[in-house]
Amino acid sequence: MSSKKKKILLLSDDVRMSSGVATQSKEIVMNTLHKYEWVQIAAAVKHPEQGQIIDLNDAVRNETGIKDAYLKLYPTSGYGNPDILRQVIEIEKPDAILHYTDPRFWLWLYAIEHELRVNIPIFYYNIWDDLPTPYYNTNYYRCSDLLMAISKQTYGINKRILMNYGYEDWQIKYTPHGVDEKHHYKIEDGDTKLRQFETKFGLDKFDFKVLYLNRNIRRKNPGDVVMAYKYFVDQLPPEEQKKCCLIFHTAPVDENGTDLKAVCAAAIPNYNVIFTHNNNEHFQDEEINFIFNSADVYLNMASNEGFGLASLEALMAETPIVVNVTGGLQDQCGFKKEDGTYLTADDYVELGSNHRGKYKEHGEWVKPVFPSNISLQGSPLTPYIFDDRAQFEEVGIAIKYWYDVGPKERKRCGKLGREFAMDKNIGMTAKLLGDNIIDAIDTAFEKWKPREKYTLEVV
């Protein structure tokens, strides 16, 4: 073990789990192991290994070839507490803390931030779904020395809030999600394993397949997906209708969403729908790549979406997308300014969001649908946040566009989508994610100054 490496304590979903937070936590760790040692307080809802210490050094050394790779997990049910954190700090003696996911999960961490920042910095890999600027998050953001914003919209939010508190440019960085291009890629037509996968789920019977791969929860609007698909298929002659299919890779029933089989039975009883998640068995990377390759278009109609990892995975597999213009989904659209250059994170400091359609020119790999209704929602902990609703008829028209252009054009546009995601200036591969994390953290280590033991502030 190299004593020259900085050790970082990661607070997030267990890197071995399958959630979006877990997936990106793993990519961050695996793509920076050559630079840092990692310890994780590894969260799960009811963690079966709570109280154990999991040493993954041999596993990651074998996988990466990095001889001094260091990764140790401290599993916990929930996101931890001050006692667990203090114990792990005492054992591991990290040089910094990196936490990730919604700030409301970290109120206990923010309550002791001053105690911690006297000795080590706190970093935050953060995202916020929508406008208006959440000033109720101000004190949460101020508990971190470095904020890495996952979306351009979040970068703008962080900047607008923290510029009033003396934060310097190095303390706020745009650091988008990244996926491994070796796990998500275009499979050649006729591949035996892909054909076997399609046969297993009955996908081989259809010529045009629309994929929903998301959680079955309200803000993802799976019911609107059904209605958009209906609007699309209703426009086709009967023989062509039979050759189309809607794929749901999600739990068919979820108390946080709906009963999708009941919705489909009522709304599209005569149209083809396939559920690939009936047994709640999570697909491995290879199977996820198969399903993106099998689909002709990927669809995300979420009315609040921090980033939209699955649409990026679709682009990496060279599958065109239809997305609602909200949150981080707009970063995957390749919106351009009047001079032909892409919108940057700094543009979003003033723009806020492109959900009102100020900029319309976009990449050929996507049919963006702008919200037809923007309403202000809220709760006691999040008093206000916009809900961006796309009209399902407009989404149906976007699906019809991809149907009409045919497979050759879809293939061409899908390839452009992968090229966009892999562009080093876009930064949406796993390796580029690691590079961006290293750049931000190394700068923070260089410039960070410990907090004074006591501070006074006018309130």
Outline where the language-model segments fall.
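N-terminal subdomain of nucleotide-sugar transferases
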Residues: 1-58, 92, 457-459
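A short, active-site helix/loop in glycosyltransferases that binds the activated sugar's phosphate group
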Residues: 134-174, 179-187, 262
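A short helix/loop element that forms part of the nucleotide-sugar donor recognition site in Leloir-type
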Residues: 185-203
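Nucleotide-activated donor-binding/catalytic signature segment of Leloir-type glycosyltransferases, i.e.
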Residues: 257-286, 290
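Aromatic "clamp/platform" in nucleotide-sugar-dependent glycosyltransferases that forms part
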Residues: 303
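Short hydrophobic beta-strand element within catalytic cores of glycosyltransferases
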Residues: 320-323, 340-344
